Amino acid sequence: SLYRISETALKNLPSKASAEIRIADEIDTILLDAYPFNTQTDTVDLPAQLKLTEPPDSTLQLIQFVGPIKSEWLQAVEETGVTLVHYIANNAYLIWSDPTSRARLDILPGSHSFMQYSSVYEPYFKSGPSIRTRVLQQKDPSEVVRVTIQIYNHDQVTKSQQIIDNLTLKEIVPWHSILSYQNTTVTVLAGDLATIAQLPD
């Protein structure tokens, strides 16, 4: 069984009960390649160039449950109107939300004990190491960079595709579908990488 208890309650448990308990604080950590963090203890501190100042109308969002995910929890999340995109360890999901569904979703952590974290999926999380370095160092905005871009395939995806196409210097691999995503490989200017990362999908 999985229980959340305070430090005080843990210290006051009988020694026999304490010996049988395994503290599983790793389940609170979302294992993003770019920025693993504990949703209950860590402060997410991201550079301004790769951080949203405010969420777009519709955007990718990151949520985390209190433990191993149950089907009824996913159902409750879907009933807010969001779309489940894919699972992320530990006990987290990437979702697609609009303002209406996001407002409903924001109520869940307070009214349901199964959700403990909900926030926009920041541009920093989407970007590979070499892209982050170029955006943050801003050494040569005119550098031509080869990138593979993956965006969530929603009903307004062509808007983001058009922005990317307008920034493309050379198309290497045309747009194509893989699971829930549209993918392409192109060359762009390093100075345009932040603009692409800031796209909502």
Regions found by a protein language model. Give the residues of each.
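Autoinhibitory N-terminal propeptides
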Residues: S1-D201
